Amino acid sequence: APWNGPLFPTKDLYLFLSVFSGGVVSYWLNVGIGLGAVVAAALVGVLAGTLLPVYAVPLYCGSFVGMASPKVLTAGHVVLASAIAGAIYVLAQDVFNGFGGKLGTIACAGCVLTAAFSGKALLTGTVPPADVASRMIITSVIAAVAAYLVNVRLGKGAVMGSAIVGLVGGLVLPALIPDIGATLATVCICASFAGMSSKARIPNEALMALAGVLVGLVFVYSSPYMGGAGGKLGTTAFGSVIAV
């Protein structure tokens, strides 16, 4: 039957505004306050899950836009990227549900499209050496399983599962391992996105550990590409979860 309702239902407007707000606030915490991308996004997730659980998912989605590097996207660019991500979120709200990393993929699309429209080049990097890569993969497995446990076993939900693990990693790892702690914190929150998967998609911890291995491997070997784009980490997790 043809749709006779409003062109943009109120529910969708609230979802759009949640994604948009999450992006702007996360970028402000990340760059304006100087908390860094991992802590900023995780903090938005924890606050959203605690204070606004009904809109925690779109707010957390937006927070990934705010993880963008200021070397790639300025505050003005993030406003546009957040709006694009909000529109994509509304359009994609009924597909790929339960797959960890979906939200980051939406955010990444907003950031990459904004960078393309603005003529901004994404950052490049190098593949880390084997000793660092091995620690990254171990971190990825632990973070993915930990987020899954909080999400599914403890019943706290996907947003809190990921955000708690990301916040702990973002605060603890740089202090604990000064030389590569910041990198491991990034891996930690990346893998936590895989842990957002529902039990229907990833039924047990063993398969989540496998997803964590894949996230770690993809993270390591994608290091030279798409740097500075908010949502790249979620895209990494999304592909890994689908592969499992």
Predicted regions and their residues:
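Intrinsically disordered, low-complexity regions flanking or connecting the multi-pass transmembrane cores
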Residues: A1-N4
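C-terminal transmembrane helix-loop-helix hairpin of multi-pass membrane proteins
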Residues: L7-A121, V127-V141, Y148, V152-V244
